[in-house]
């Protein structure tokens, strides 16, 4: 039996007549298509014409453009990535006048403010009021940026989705769109912005439009409210509830609505994955993810293979952080990683003993190709040699499409993409390729840029994109926010973390639009009153979308702050959390562990005949406190590598002193020789010994021993040598033996 995520019955007439069905987002579209496929009763059937509203707007624009209709054919519709890069470029050019800590974050906020202005004040009144509020510094800056953005769009014939919607709604009666008399269903559009309301009104003037909302109150709905002492307990009980329901009914759609607390969401997803995958009832899930969600807790750049890709790409800068080089040495995503594993470990160990926090690539490449050393890595060395040959092509300014080609070639030199093995890594690579295509297509938005800027833009793009969570119709559990869940149907629903601090959500008005203007237009986030009304409407729709049971919960204490239930759930009957736990058979231990396991202890590894173990009191101390630590440290030599330090570390400084002392006392064989030296002669010999030490350290640490740093270090060593000779001259008679 299939899982029902949408009440399809009211929509069946529209599907039978092959009407155009518009929905707010892809989640509802996927739910409709899955429900229809499960009820079709045949292996072959006609796919309903269901479109998310933004996709339909883009399709209409492309249709008119392909038919050479003005102004559609004269303007290129850009995606969200290109739009963001335009805003980012405008804001970066204004940094000399308006210093900002995070231009990328500012660009996102400014872009969102512009879209809100167009969506909620599309009549033009907002622009007049915006012009009259330029005495406010943030509003004045925003007005200037908007003017530059619009000018850039006119010069390059570009337009974004919100602007193209305003043009489209005035042209829907053209024959090219084939909309006259067509049946159009607007499904589950709750609280659309005024711009969409105007679009729907224009659509209603040329087509047979019907508005359909599928939420309706269930007469037998059971409601409960739970209070828990802390967030961790609340999450665990919610997960136990979902696990129990999935065992009892394999066709139930189980929803968990999380507030916008990122910490709560990450813990919830982690525990859900652990507990549902341990469920004795087989759960068919996508790549070990047993629930559907739109809120991935990891970004694309957080994937190890993508992180290492940027580490390789940043090698084009010449001088690198030593930690980044070590990351490349440890990476399993480069060619030869398995064959040269031991040699690369030795290379990192050598670096941590002898390198500072900065590393010159030419020196590192030379060491990699040292055949007589145990850190000889010819495969990785060949990649660095290819980088040196490619360095000339990484200079100058070029389009993003050109840099995408260089990025692919540079990564290919290291065999990066050839090392992906698992399905998850391959899907991450597919998303990476899509990101490269988006960046290449944004050439008109970013203009001519340097390779360093191109890498920065790509990192921005990958930091914004969440790792894709594909919708799996076989997963029973769905984790959404309130906004994401509105329009779907659930058999059971748990409202998690609905306390008086998180629901309704706090107001977060845009700093770039006048506050009175935002409140007057009822923009989401503009004012607490607006937030309350929006929350009340969304909450009512959500409650009417549940057919069997609705649970709501909150925890009473967050650090030292006391929390109360949200006013929206205060009238839910309060249930005993302990009783709820007993009813669902919860246990404190991890599910699935019901018996003690017997494990055979492996015998200790015998010492080889040539193996020597060193250790003093620390060996005895480690053995008594933790035998494993003693084995790891003294037998396996498994100790943490030395940390890289800025400048010279204490070990390098000590080496310099030892070299200087060795040279100094090569000509002093006894105390009598030392006492016989005049002050001038002592200074001369100290200077000569210091020069030898500085020459040695300069050859070993060329990046650190800059002229100024060498001058400071030379003065330090020279002073120590003079003081050392004074102390030695006060000792009793001695003779230098060695």
Where are these regions (language model features)?
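Polyanion-engaging groove/track-forming segments
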Residues: 1-734
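Active-site metal-binding core of divalent-cation-utilizing nuclease and nuclease-like domains
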Residues: 737-738
């Amino acid at each position: 039996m299939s899982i029902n995520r949408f009440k399809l019955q009211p929509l069946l007439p529209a599907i039978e007549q092959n009407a155009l069905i518009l929905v707010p987002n892809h989640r509802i579209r996927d739910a409709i298509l899955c429900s229809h496929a499960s009820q079709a009763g045949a292996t072959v059937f006609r796919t309903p014409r269901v479109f998310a509203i933004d996709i339909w707007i883009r399709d209409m624009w492309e249709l008119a453009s392909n038919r050479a209709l003005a102004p559609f054919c004269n303007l290129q519709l850009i995606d969200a990535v290109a739009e963001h890069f335009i805003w980012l470029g405008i804001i970066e050019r204004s940094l000399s006048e308006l210093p900002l800590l995070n231009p990328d974050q500012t660009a996102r906020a400014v872009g969102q403010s512009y879209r809100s202005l167009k969506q909620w004040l599309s009549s033009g009144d907002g622009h007049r009021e915006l012009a009259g509020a330029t005495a406010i510094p943030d509003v004045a800056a925003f007005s200037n940026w908007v003017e530059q953005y619009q000018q850039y769009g006119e010069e390059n014939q570009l337009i974004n989705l919100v602007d193209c919607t305003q043009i489209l709604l005035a042209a829907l009666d053209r024959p090219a769109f084939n909309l006259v008399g067509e049946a159009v269903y607007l499904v589950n559009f709750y609280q659309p912005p005024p711009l969409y309301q105007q679009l729907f009104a224009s659509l209603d003037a040329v087509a047979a439009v019907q508005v359909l909302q599928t939420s309706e109150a269930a007469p037998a709905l059971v409601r409960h409210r739970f209070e828990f002492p802390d967030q961790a307990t609340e999450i665990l009980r919610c997960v136990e509830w979902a696990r129990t329901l999935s065992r009892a009914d394999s066709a139930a759609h189980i929803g968990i609505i999380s507030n916008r607390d990122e910490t709560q969401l990450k813990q919830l997803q982690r525990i859900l994955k652990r507990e549902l995958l341990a469920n004795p009832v087989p759960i068919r899930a996508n790549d070990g993810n047993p629930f559907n969600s739109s809120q991935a807790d990891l970004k694309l750049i957080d994937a190890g293979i993508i992180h290492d890709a940027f580490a390789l790409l940043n090698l084009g800068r010449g001088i690198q952080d030593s930690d980044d080089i070590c990351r490349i040495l440890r990476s399993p995503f480069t060619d030869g990683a398995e064959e040269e594993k031991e040699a690369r470990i030795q290379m990192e160990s050598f670096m941590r003993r002898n390198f500072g926090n900065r590393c010159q690539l030419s020196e590192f490449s030379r060491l990699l190709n040292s055949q007589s050393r145990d850190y000889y890595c010819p495969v990785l060395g060949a990649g660095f040699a290819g980088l040196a040959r490619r360095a000339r092509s990484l200079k100058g300014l070029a389009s993003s499409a050109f840099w995408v080609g260089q990025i692919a070639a540079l990564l290919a030199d290291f065999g990066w993409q050839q090392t992906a093995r698992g399905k998850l890594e391959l899907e991450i690579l597919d998303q990476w390729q899509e990101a490269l295509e988006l960046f290449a297509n944004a050439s008109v938005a970013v203009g001519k840029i340097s390779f360093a800027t191109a890498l920065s833009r790509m990192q921005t793009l990958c930091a914004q994109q969440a790792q894709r969570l594909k919708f799996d119709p076989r997963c029973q559990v769905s984790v959404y926010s309130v906004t994401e869940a509105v329009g779907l149907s659930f058999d059971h629903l748990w409202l998690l973390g609905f306390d008086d601090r998180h629901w309704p959500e706090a107001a977060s008005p845009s700093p770039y639009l006048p506050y009175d203007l935002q409140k007057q237009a009822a923009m989401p986030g503009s004012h607490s009153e607006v937030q309350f009304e929006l929350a009340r409407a969304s909450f009512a729709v959500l409650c009417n979308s549940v057919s069997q049971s609705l649970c709501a919960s909150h925890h009473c204490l967050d650090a030292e702050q006391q929390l109360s239930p949200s006013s929206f759930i205060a009238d839910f009957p309060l249930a005993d959390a302990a009783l709820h736990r007993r009813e669902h058979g919860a246990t404190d231990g991890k599910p699935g562990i019901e018996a003690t396991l017997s494990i055979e202890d492996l015998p200790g590894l015998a010492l080889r005949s040539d193996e020597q173990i060193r250790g003093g009191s620390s060996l005895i101390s480690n053995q008594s406190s933790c035998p494993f630590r003693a084995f790891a440290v003294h037998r396996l030599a498994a100790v943490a590598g030395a940390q890289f330090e800025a400048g010279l570390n204490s070990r390098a400084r000590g080496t310099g002193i030892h070299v200087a002392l060795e040279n100094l006392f090569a000509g002093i064989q006894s105390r009598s020789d030392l006492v016989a030296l005049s002050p001038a002669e002592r200074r001369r010999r100290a200077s000569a010994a210091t020069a030898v030490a500085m020459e040695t350290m300069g050859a070993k640490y060329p990046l650190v021993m800059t002229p100024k740093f060498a001058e400071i270090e030379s003065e330090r060593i020279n002073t120590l040598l003079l003081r050392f000779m004074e102390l030695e001259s006060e000792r009793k008679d001695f003779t230098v033996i060695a």
